[in-house]
Swiss-Prot record:
This is DNA transformation protein TfoX. InterPro entries: TfoX-like (IPR047525), TfoX-like_gammaprotbact (IPR026256), TfoX_C (IPR007077), TfoX_N (IPR007076). Disruption phenotype: Does not bind transforming DNA, is transformation deficient. Loss of expression of the competence regulatory element (CRE) regulon required for development of competence. GO terms for biological process: cellular response to amino acid stimulus; cellular response to cAMP; cellular response to purine-containing compound; cellular response to starvation; DNA import into cell involved in transformation; establishment of competence for transformation; positive regulation of DNA-templated transcription; positive regulation of establishment of competence for transformation.
């Protein structure tokens, strides 16, 4: 049966209406459904939509009546245990379906970020950071990526502030985005306001004076 001609276009269109930026690619086990052309969150095969989920999300899908992907009829050895066929209960509710898809996409992106950061060791190899930033962090005892991830951007800036090692807001933006594997110049004004509030809370808990506004250096 030609699944694409009969189903995949409409399936893709429906999912696009729910979360936006959905496309599909022909796979040897059916069709992969992608968000923003790079994050494969679902598979369409044999008139069933399989959503990717692991851990807590997998448990949630199972409780909602979703069956795990077992075998591919064309390739009996091909198994995708982290994909679950969405139940009628989910498919009847656009709101629930959208919620689960968003959770799946978020989980995949978090796993990719985890994998990327795990491969890095030197601080200067992170986005936005240079050898100058690395040296400043090493001076306060943060010697590698794993330690920075553990302590977090806010507490790292606390240590920099206490040691007088250039704890600026620009450094903070760079640290936050480095741990998200993205360019700090892409931060919006609203994101900076939210992060500033978070930073001030941590600083005050550590007996430091917080920033009153974004340009209050």
């Amino acid at each position: 049966m030609n699944i694409k001609d009969e189903h995949i276009d409409s399936v893709c269109s429906l999912l696009d209406q729910l979360v936006g930026n959905v496309s599909f690619k022909n796979l040897f086990t059916g069709y992969g459904l992608f968000h923003k052309e790079e994050t494969m969150f679902a598979i369409w095969q044999n008139k069933k939509l399989y959503l990717r989920g692991e851990g807590v999300l997998a448990i949630q899908l199972t409780k909602l009546g979703c069956e795990p992907f077992t075998t591919n009829e064309l390739n009996k050895r091909f198994v995708l245990s982290q994909y679950y066929a969405l139940s009628d209960q989910i498919l009847r509710s656009n709101r629930l379906c959208r919620k689960l898809i968003i959770l799946s996409i978020k989980q995949i992106l978090e796993q990719k970020l985890e994998c990327t950061l795990r491969k890095l060791n030197r601080l200067k190899d992170l986005p936005n950071l240079t050898i100058k930033h690395e040296r400043a962090l090493i001076k306060v005892g943060i010697t590698n990526v794993a330690m920075l991830r553990e302590i977090g951007a806010e507490n790292a800036l606390v240590e920099l502030k206490k040691s007088g090692s250039g704890a600026t807001l620009d450094f903070y933006w760079k640290l936050v985005c480095a741990l998200q594997n993205k360019n700090s110049q892409m931060l919006s004004q609203a994101e900076k306001e939210r992060l500033l509030k978070k930073l001030n809370e941590v600083w005050r808990k550590n007996g430091l004076k917080g920033y009153r506004k974004l340009d209050d250096e």
